[in-house]
Amino acid sequence: MLGIKLIEGEYDTHNWLEAVRGYEKEPEKGARCAICFDRRFEITAQKADELGEKSFSSTLLTSPKKSLKQLKHAGDALGKKFDIVFEAPDYRKASGTQEQNILAKQDQLYRQDYCGCLFGLTMQREDQQKLADELFSPISKQIQPESIEARLELYQKRWDYEDEGIAYKIVKERFLNWRQEFGYVKVKKEVIPSHFLPYSTLKKRYSRGKIDTQIANLHYMNRDEVKFITLKTYNHLAKTNYATVKELIFNSPSFEIELKIRNQIINNGYDLSCIITVDNIPTSKLEIHFQSHIYEDVKEVMLKIT
């Protein structure tokens, strides 16, 4: 679109984590940021020098979460090392940040509200008393609502619409989001494969009891509103053919399909009972270790204009 070639550098997570070891609790604009700038700018300056460029810069200069003085200090030092100029205009002065917001909204661009560092994000979400759901990554690789993967999917669709000349509008929706932190079931002190459906919750992180009632294909535990279904029932409702629950755990269908399964099992959109899929229904006492999060959230939705 701009005619500028994008050169992607190595996403060197391991070495970055080693470099900032001991600085995990540093605040935004602190020593950890300085270490990060030095590493990033050295790679950028080196590449600019290789390409024969006379100057380099950084999009971090537009971020209200970063120190302009700190950025300029790091950039100038690396520029001197490679004998090139670090361009550091103050994009924020004269209401520059507000202008950025206006333009981003006008052009329907995604605007990230954190710097991208997992330590900075964690502290920011703690201050906001919000779940850092950007750091959740299901072992099933399922794309969950308002996850980074969901945003990538949305904006890829946006590019498709742009290429096809389809008119669209990106709007925001407030909704109830959910994330599973961990979950497993024990029978006779042995962990059995188990899969928890979306919007499953448990009052505490631990429950134990026995399944004492079956109505149709739904099996009820005698405590904490917990319910079980067999893999056979799951396959029937999802129109899938998983051979084992373990296979299901590592390769779940889409979040939307699992929501439909839940709604078929319990015809109540407000129900937050824990619903667990197992290979076979346990006949002896069992233990459940489970933690999930239910929280208000906002997501972007793309609407086709006809």
What kind of feature is each model-predicted range?
Residues 270-306:
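Long mid-to-C-terminal assembly/interaction modules of large eukaryotic proteins
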Residues 68-106, 121-124, 132-146:
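C-terminal cap of thioredoxin/glutaredoxin-like
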Residues 1-60, 64-75, 81-89:
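ATP-dependent adenylation/nucleotidyltransferase module used to activate substrates
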Residues 19, 37-41, 72, 94-104, ...:
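Charged, low-complexity, helix-prone segments enriched in Lys/Glu/Asp/Gln
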Residues 6, 44, 75, 86, ...:
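Generic structural hydrophobic/aromatic packing signal, biased to beta-strands
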Residues 26-34, 104-120:
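A polyampholytic, Gly/Pro-enriched intrinsically disordered region
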Residues 122-277:
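Long, charge-rich C-terminal accessory regions
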Residues 38-42, 66-82, 114-131, 150-165:
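Short flexible/disordered coil segments
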